[in-house]
Amino acid sequence: MMYGLLKGKKGIIFGALNEQSIAWKVAERCHEEGAEFILSNAPIAMRMGEINALAEKTGSEVIAADATSMEDLGKLFDAAIAKFGKIDFILHSIGMSVNVRKGKHYTDINYDWLEKGWDVSAVSFHKVMKTAWEKDCMNEWGSILALTYIAAQRTFPDYNDMADNKSYLESIARSFGYYWGEKKVRVNTISQSPTVTTAGSGVKGFGGFMRFAEDMSPLGNATALDCANYCVAMFSDLTRKVTMQNLFNDGGFSNTGVSQKVVDKYNGE
């Protein structure tokens, strides 16, 4: 169902790789709700993915940018300003861990890889906002979002150093969000259920954990489409006074100590 919630709004969406990507679903829903946007991802990710198909579907321009590069980000935002003038929303859906990819245990992580993942997954969010801030390119009541996961606050062993990255990401949203208030721009993170994406599927034991989260969540896991709908709401004018928050979109998992389904399994029922 479409409501025209984003009619006339312009933005930048980072991180769409393929149809499994949450950012891909967000782009589709933003388009359906009337928004125009630029799609961006790192050059290597664009070669691996299918972003051009999404661009064609949504009538969007694709601009390659390494979100860890201030030079690339500067060029991207200059292009957005030339195309749209000031913009209304930004989605940061970027994350990676070389330690996870290489199967390094948390007690034996490679610190060079740690730094790389930290830069890509968290510091890039600060760099994106710093670039937008310096170019003064956000309209009043604009909205900036990043996607995160509850492992930022609770221990999930196989999530490895991505948990640390997400924790820092959430802190950046609060810290920079305070200053963005001066410009009447809101900054939030959405803590999503475990979701089948290219990045998420690389975590050891991911399938089992998804089933566990489903059993633990009163409403079940939130899908990528559910997350996209939440992003649309957060980009819309209906949420103007929501800022500096970590918003759980997880079917109630974050506030459930134990569910009856899980208890029954341990009781053999």
What label would you give each PLM region?
Residues 3-39:
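Canonical Rossmann dinucleotide-binding motif of NAD(H)/NADP(H)-dependent dehydrogenases/reductases
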Residues 15-25, 95-182, 191-196, 220, ...:
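Catalytic loop of short-chain dehydrogenase/reductase
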Residues 123, 189, 207-242, 247-251:
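C-terminal helical subdomain
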Residues 57, 63-74, 78-83, 89-117, ...:
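Conserved mid-core segment of classical short-chain dehydrogenase/reductases
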Residues 13, 91, 145, 187-190, ...:
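Hydrophobic structural elements of the Rossmann-like NAD(P)H-binding subdomain
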Residues 33-51:
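Conserved glycine-rich Rossmann-like NAD(P)H-binding loop of the short-chain dehydrogenase/reductase
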Residues 243-269:
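Short C-terminal tail/terminal secondary-structure segment
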Residues 30, 180, 234:
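Aromatic pocket-lining residues of Rossmann-like dinucleotide-binding sites
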